[in-house]
Amino acid sequence: MALPPARTLYAPGRGELFLRDTGGDGPPIMLLHGWMASADLNWWGAYGALVDAGYRVLAIDHRGHGRGLRSILPFRLSDCAADAAAALDLLGAAPATVVGYSMGGAIAQLLAHDHPETVSGIVLSGTAHDWQDPRERWFWRSMGLLWAATAVAPHWMWRIALGRLGFRDPDMASWLVSELLRASARDIAEAGRELGRFDSRSWIGSLGIPAAVVVTTRDSIVSPSKQRRLAAAMGATVFEASIDHLEVVKPGYVPALREAVESVAARPLEASPWASAGAP
């Protein structure tokens, strides 16, 4: 599996930011990953297809996730959005099309709202404009238990979870576990609680930029109906992928994602040199 080149940027007042950057002169896309994941875990199945379509692909690891920034401050979604904005500015890649999955969708919404000069279009998937219904609020309140589990027995917990998701190849499972173990248990738990507090309903319809939503139609974590309500609130074009929430690496997801990106992004130019140097 080939991954795009890694970059570490120093953002004054923030710290070191880790991201993937395929380079090239294509329209920039910033990929924002989901909760507990890293950029590579969420997006490795999509990197090659987006580069082949002519885009410059950027994918940041959020605070407390993967190789992302570690801070003594509590995890805040708004800080993740500010980190992404800083990376785009430092790279001269703003404004970019921003693509957010799950928690990354909440961060993408905040990025477009709080840093509008950095965003030219937005694609959301497997996400919502709030998680306020009783079942969701109960789930997010349980994040202290998750923190304890990931801190006490992380290898055991992740290997069981991956086995249930059908990852049987030992090399792939080892890589996935190694990526998951990079995360900070404290930040993971706090990120979950932050999601429980997130609510963009009062302003999501006022972003005024091209928007698309890829609805994960078999999603057991973020209901498809809630994803459609988000799309309606934004006036976004709807695309569909017949997957559950944790199946973004399945073949059916990437074509829908690429179509959604093409519906809002600037016209692609020549592909990045990375495309011919090792894209999957």
State what each model feature region is:
Residues 15-67:
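Conserved HGGG/HGGXW glycine-rich cap/lid loop of the alpha/beta-hydrolase fold
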Residues 44, 52, 58-97:
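Active-site loop/oxyanion-hole signature of alpha/beta-hydrolase fold enzymes
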Residues 98-100, 125:
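Short beta-strand immediately N-terminal to the catalytic nucleophile in serine-hydrolase-like folds
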Residues 100, 104, 108:
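Gly/Ala-rich beta-loop-alpha elbow adjacent to hydrolase catalytic centers
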Residues 109, 113, 121-150:
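Flexible "cap/lid" loop of the alpha/beta hydrolase fold
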Residues 133-134, 151-205:
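Conserved alpha/beta-hydrolase catalytic His-Asp/Glu region
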Residues 211-244, 250-252:
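Conserved loop-alpha-helix segment in the C-terminal half of the alpha/beta-hydrolase fold
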Residues 249-263:
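Post-His helix in hydrolase/transferase enzymes
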